[in-house]
Amino acid sequence: MSKQKHSASSSRWLKEHFDDKYANEARRKGYRSRAIFKLEEIQQKDKLLKPGMTVVDLGAAPGGWSQYAIGVVGDSGRVIACDILPMDSIAGVSFLQGDFREDAVLEALLERIQPDMVDVVMSDMAPNIAGNNSVDQPRAMYLVELALDMCRQVLAPNGSFVVKVFQGEGFDEYVKEVRNMFKVVKIRKPDSSRARSREVFVVATGYKG
């Protein structure tokens, strides 16, 4: 029974992927992933990224967001990316493979950032999905809390934060926490997000420090 369910789910994902105009466009343009279009749409609306900025990208692999960000911040800017998974190199992007929940990895990440402060913290992190919302949602909320804690450590005053969050238990409390730390907070659902997905992006500007 479970095997049939898994097969049906896999078939649906494959059909969506190959019928997906964003996935097709990403392949055509040589982008790392369709996720790049989500950040592109957020950038068009909120103008988070500017030339010369320093950006931290959490959960970076396969590199779509880093690829887009370095294209905006340019040679005078910096993108520092981190992920548990490997990521092929991107010109201008400093990538650290590891779990930043571990002290040694966090220290290595902070060493790459400091003594500078960061203009934008980005997180497209998501947990491995178990298929059980009572397990998946707390895992997802734990990751977004970690991303917010990274802001507390490295984000410059008036800096910006964009994070993928799954709507569900803990979502409203999290948004309230972000509002306490930033002057302006918006919830975005990019067109390139799949309609059935619970993901939204919390976009926060004007870090109070």
Swiss-Prot record:
It comes from the Bacteria. The active site is at 164 (proton acceptor). Keywords: Cytoplasm, Methyltransferase, rRNA processing, S-adenosyl-L-methionine, Transferase. It is found in: Cytoplasm. Coiled coil: none annotated. Its EC number is 2.1.1.166. One of its GO terms (molecular function) is rRNA (uridine-2'-O-)-methyltransferase activity. InterPro entries: RNA_methyltr_RlmE, RNA_MeTrfase_FtsJ_dom, rRNA-MeTfrase_E, SAM-dependent_MTases_sf. PANTHER family: RIBOSOMAL RNA METHYLTRANSFERASE (PTHR10920), RRNA METHYLTRANSFERASE 2, MITOCHONDRIAL (PTHR10920:SF18). Belongs to the class I-like SAM-binding methyltransferase superfamily. RNA methyltransferase RlmE family. This is Ribosomal RNA large subunit methyltransferase E. It comes from Vibrio vulnificus (strain YJ016).
